[in-house]
Amino acid sequence: MTRATVCVVGSGAREHAIAWSLARSADVVVTPGNPGIGGVAPSGHTIRSDPKPPQLLDASLYVIGPEVPLVEGLADELRAGGRLVFGPGAAGARLEGSKAFMKQLCAGAGVPTAAWACFAEPSPAIEFMKSLAPPYVVKTDGLAAGKGVLVTSDLAEAAADVAAKLSGSAFGGAGRRVVIEEAMAGPELSLFAVCDGTRALPLPEAQDFKRLGDGDTGPNTGGMGAYSPVPSAGDAAVSEAMGRIVEPALDALSRSGADYRGLLYAGVMLTPDGPKLVEFNVRFGDPETEVVLPRVTGDLVELLAAAAGGDLRPAAAEAACTPDAAVCVVAAAPGYPEAPRSGTPISGVRAAGTLPGVTVFHAGTRRLDDGTLVTAGGRVLCVSALGSTITAARARAYEAIARVGFEGMTYRRDIAEAAAKSEVT
């Protein structure tokens, strides 16, 4: 696909990272994009943002970043117009759009996951929780931007959360049904698989940090940082998770008539009984993308185009990755995740990006008419760094984020800390 143009749909740090990676071998247009997306890549290919909808942009390949347009059927619409699309249609996107659907599909496919039940009324949900040992896991059935999960050992808190979700006061229609799960124990793994409808090819694994505060304290967020690879997992765990979780689910989707051509992201718990599924997402994870894609050394355009075309095999070698590690740290606005403050001037982004191996991906930013860069969302920037080890990558990421500043900026100081310590013990 020489001098191809790829259209990326989305506006966050994930889409910035996807565009940055694709621009090694193609011109990239991102819709609607953000102020950080633009310019000329080292390869000579251009990257630009464009507010026009993807249906009005001419491209050789379309890559859909966020889950909402996938669930709403954007991939189907583009394919109906003869476009080559990396992203599942609405039938496959139900895997993330409804946790109850996901659980039912997994049960039929024999995918190991936590015991569960789905409820639309508080009383039976609370009675079910009483039958479980704490901690209790309460999830919205629908999309909640990664914030619809409560894990607590307090039954009263869990019951109040169920009531808030089912009433619609917490997450609107997304919470009109809740999934209650048995808690699982073990380290978590984010596993990305590029799928062509029948085959799946893993990308480098990652681990993310969902809680706002150090030591996994505070509320759940969309993700405050990540690292890759995950030494506690290893190739054997990834291979087992692919065989027990990803491949059976993809086969079940195929048998149901869903031609799943896109990214299947499995959140996996490495339990004493082997890997078990926490949940599926139908797109690249954020912030994991910001550490996974910098490690991919192959031609991402060729890889995603092959999957979109229905046959990964000719491009399988393009999933190759560097042995180097990557660590990213998210800078969040004050008030995140409940009520983030916007409009605060940001400094130091360019200085951070001049450090070796560092890339600053924009998430929630906006540029004023006078050129000032300001905050425009909860997660504002994602600072990603490559290094020969997790320790080295982590040091670079934290050196870089220390150069960035805006009033009330918050970030975790312990991203990849345990993994870095494990390298020297």
Where are the regions a protein language model picked out?
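Active-site "cap" helix and flanking loop/linker of ATP-utilizing ligase/carboxylase catalytic domains
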Residues: M242-L264, N281-L355, L368
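ATP-binding N-terminal substructure of ATP-dependent carboxylate-amine bond-forming enzymes
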Residues: M1-A91
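Solvent-exposed alpha-helices and their adjacent loops that cap or buttress functional pockets
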Residues: M1-T2, A23, G39, L56, ...
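Internal nucleotide-binding/catalytic subdomain
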Residues: T152-E288
